[in-house]
């Protein structure tokens, strides 16, 4: 029985000294038992290394076996000693099971808890509580100890926390005692077991040199071993003994010094012999790292500088984190590729360790960077299971039932691809399934189906109506309906019976049985196995392990649930919450996929000291030292107060260190990380973060740089074309070609700069050579040539071939005028929208188009109803008009396309707003009619619609012998004014926003609607007036803004009705015909003034004016406008048939562009900075300029 310390700084080979002591004792006492204990995290590597050293010591380097020496972690030692003990055979309770049990305890005691009761539903709280319970156990605190601490605490938050912890902890211990073995119980059981053993002849070697702390439970095992007669040797990272008093917080070796002091005092009080300290004396690191160790342990203020160049410590900065990782990868590849005279000096991937304080900032970059560099790597961090599709399936499955089949929940289940329909007894093909799910999602987004719609037996009917449809279901629509209903009926036939059985389950065991049977029968386990096999085929061992681990964890939680709560009445809500709590604490077991791979970890974790090279990435002042943030139920202040009272309890009790203590340990933690390297230590940091904020070197690094006068290298993500040193950018062929492309792109951009002077830029010869090598490579050359060809790519669409034009458009174009307006805004957008027929998916929403359709339908129905009953609109009373409106509105709202207006309370409110608006407009139109001789003749007049029995002729234009264009449309309202034998026909277009007739846009083809509609009226005048003898003139084209205007007090000074008339005043163009204008507004027949209804005024001399808007045009001017509009239609059709698809978005008045609201930006990739991409700027034109241009232009001349 004795205690022996092996001391020394991190630069020394502690293990060499420990193994030497072990060998000497083993040779002297070969029949004794030897245990070599290390942290679980590095057990495997340590075991291999210790056995290799023993083999060398005993002269058996090729083949060596040892039965007396065991290398274990503390938990593995428990298994070795107690595997046949009854106490060790009880069922294990996993972290997930602990969370489930704690959740149930919190529920049971919710009324007694002062603080924790309200936190049960908070995400992460149960896991946080589990950590706190575990800390109490590892501190050797029993429930009665916590009760005593609560009683002694002053009233306040701490007392309330301890009160709640005591209740939960007591119930937790009672629920698990002799029933389950928790992770924290294993060491308690081991301690109890050791107290019953005679350990004389047992030699224990505890290696703590690679880290600083030993938890209270493990300290208890060491002291028990000493008491029971074992010889214990402990290696500590400590350069001096600590016997008289405990070290002060903040000193470099505070943690190991404190442990030395505690164990020394323990042995001294119990008169256990303490042998003379042994110091490790053999350096395990290169000379430059020895110097770093000496410097770090000295007084930086008194340092005189390192006289010899330090070739083992290196610094570099990069322009970004991504460049930083790429540079680390290139260095690793270069070092592995270099061969030395002595093979022992060669590097393997396993010789490299990449560390940073927190990996979060690099997490998303690791896989793409190292895969591209073809570097095998292993991230040594636990990953949560919470995001696995199986977990999502379970959560979403029960959410469907709880939320009554909401869209999001059903889609969450379907998109896990774990529940899939069977076709002829086999799982549905995955690609076909995805297509069906996507179509179903589009359909329900469009139709708003949710809730009981999912479980109805009737088929869902898919329809897609577009302009020109004849109302006949197509084969394509029928196929889409089939796919949608496949998913619909799968949900309807699969889920409701399952939910019904679950609700009827009498207890937890029955419910779990139903759930497992359901998942198994639906092929979930088969799908998980298929995922595993697919990952193995890809040689992705990590991904292959995830499905099995998740399913095993899930089944383990169900077993624990049945054991704990299986006999109790089943509650779905509680069951799901317990599963969620369980998965919250579950993580994957990390399994390296190969022995030779780069290790990536965090500097706060225990690391093996066998790595030859360490990269400390992200070495900024934000994380070195780290900003310690605690997220524990017991705060640092709570722990400080508790630590003062723990001494009053029996036994040794040590809580986890507070943030203050941890911050004091940062220097030691980083010291251990630095000295993890044996040959080389690299510090790196980006110059800026992702938000372009400047980042600075850590003060630790600055001190090291000053001490050793280290040169700092800077690496950029983009190479300098003129730099002959390409080594920082040479990696794999794929990685290197990307940098070659960057160089040649830079050269091309520079040489095409219009402002450049001097000789053309030429790339350095090394880049020319690299390009040649890569493009001529037998395996990689074809891809390299394709990638290099991208340099000559121009973002410019290629003209369509005649065959493509015919396939897309045929020989005849049937079009609305708005499509041709799109063509004039941007030819390529027209091609995407109407050639390829790309469009955004429909959603169940009240769009501007939907509200416009409602307004049009109501006003159309109102006027037709009045005409049917032979009631002139101007003579309809307020009561009559209100009754007609109510009837028509009710009929319109019953139509399927307006069901959205009854889908929610918000939509019901919007429905009332729409009804109020259309009512106001109807009364406004009636009041306008009272002042005018114009009467609505027809509404919603179709012209040129294929498949319609009623309607007017299309506007037909023959382009050439084989091509033609036919324009169709719908006129909202046609007004007629009869003056003696002269008929005037005018059109009114309803708009949901302010519109006016824009001569400039009409000239450029951006606003052709009104002129096209007037032309259609002119071509169908006889059919419209019902006589081929009548004299007909066009009255004009007017916009009416559909609105329920807001009136200010000043607006109604002239009367309320007059104010409303002014707000609803027509805008547009009218024929400058005195006879017409005189009858348009009866108030102006006897005097002058501005019309309240129409956009004109009568002057004192009796003439008429259109004002600034140039609303009045002569007959000749109107004819020229119509002729020019026809020319625009023909010119557009000619360009379309010629295959023109230029990316030529217009820009008007230096602010309005064709791309402002385009849904195709990601396809167009338009960039005005590119030489080949430029806006088509349209010179601004006034109304007078347009009319003058049309007067001087001759027929057929280009409008631009």
Curated annotation (Swiss-Prot):
- One Pfam family recorded for the sequence: PDDEXK_1
Q: List the disulfide bonds.
A: none
- Keywords, in A-Z order: ATP-binding, DNA damage, DNA repair, DNA-binding, Exonuclease, Helicase, Hydrolase, Nuclease, Nucleotide-binding
In short, the EC number is 3.1.-.-
InterPro entries according to UniProt: ADDB_N, DNA_helicase_suRexB, P-loop_NTPase, PDDEXK_AddAB-type
**Cofactor entry:** Mg(2+)
Further remark:
Despite having helicase-like domains, this subunit does not have helicase activity.
Quaternary structure and interacting proteins, as annotated: Heterodimer of AddA and RexB.
- Protein name, as recorded: ATP-dependent helicase/deoxyribonuclease subunit B
Q: Which organism does this record belong to?
A: Lactiplantibacillus plantarum (strain ATCC BAA-793 / NCIMB 8826 / WCFS1)
What is the taxonomic lineage of the source species? Bacteria, Bacillati, Bacillota, Bacilli, Lactobacillales
Annotated gene: rexB
